[in-house]
């Protein structure tokens, strides 16, 4: 079976920046990939925090040029929240896949076995994160949108413009 593909339609400020399409490596990290996929579709409804388990409307709160774009905190919006479809946090599935370069999709965490909903998209090779963060996908289309997001980032991570996931979901025909 083909790996699932999901999308983000990104707003930068008030401008529609375009669509980012990501392949999720369900063949290597099925639990992590399924969490991200379900948070893209919103199919699991409301979480324990009382918020929709859905990336739609959430922001990329931390963008550091030459490093990564981080998002997925749909409960607090500032990097201190988030929730997985399995409850609050879940374990590191494995570290088989590496942070090999731009477009790699990986889980943000606050230490071992603290995966929730926060994730980041690498804009460079970040091998120092190997063995600490679970890689579970990659950008397969729309990397130009990620570069546009990176352009509004800062060394401290605070974007100069709000970067929002205006819409998201799963592409039903992953082979296309």
Swiss-Prot record:
Ubiquitous, with highest levels in flowers and lowest levels in roots. It is found in: Cytoplasm. It catalyses: [protein]-peptidylproline (omega=180) = [protein]-peptidylproline (omega=0). GO terms for cellular component: cytosol; Golgi apparatus; mitochondrion. It is an enzyme of class 5 (isomerase). InterPro entries: Cyclophilin-like_dom_sf (IPR029000), Cyclophilin-type_PPIase (IPR024936), Cyclophilin-type_PPIase_CS (IPR020892), Cyclophilin-type_PPIase_dom (IPR002130). Its main location: cytoplasm. Transmembrane segments: none annotated. Binds cyclosporin A (CsA). CsA mediates some of its effects via an inhibitory action on PPIase. GO terms for biological process: protein folding; signal transduction. Residues 7-170 form the PPIase cyclophilin-type domain. Keywords: Chaperone, Cytoplasm, Isomerase, Rotamase. PANTHER family: PEPTIDYL-PROLYL CIS-TRANS ISOMERASE (PTHR11071), PEPTIDYL-PROLYL CIS-TRANS ISOMERASE D-RELATED (PTHR11071:SF561). This is Peptidyl-prolyl cis-trans isomerase CYP19-3. It comes from Arabidopsis thaliana. The lineage of its organism: Eukaryota, Viridiplantae, Streptophyta, Embryophyta, Tracheophyta.
């Amino acid at each position: 079976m083909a790996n699932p593909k999901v999308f983000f339609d990104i707003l930068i400020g008030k401008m529609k920046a375009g669509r980012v399409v990501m392949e999720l490596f369900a063949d290597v990290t099925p639990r992590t990939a399924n969490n991200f996929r379900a948070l893209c579709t919103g199919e699991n409804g409301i979480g324990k925090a009382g918020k929709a388990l859905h990336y739609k409307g959430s922001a990329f709160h931390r963008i550091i040029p030459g490093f990564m774009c981080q998002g997925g905190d749909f409960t607090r919006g500032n990097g201190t929240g988030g929730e997985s479809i399995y409850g609050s946090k879940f374990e590191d599935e494995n570290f088989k896949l590496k942070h090999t370069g731009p477009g790699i999709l990986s889980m943000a965490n606050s230490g071992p076995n603290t995966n929730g909903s926060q994730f980041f998209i690498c804009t460079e090779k970040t091998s120092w994160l190997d063995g600490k963060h679970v890689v579970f996908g990659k950008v397969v289309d729309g990397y130009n949108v990620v570069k546009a997001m990176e352009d509004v980032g800062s060394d401290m991570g605070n974007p100069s413009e709000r970067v929002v996931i205006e819409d998201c979901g799963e592409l039903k025909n992953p082979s296309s």
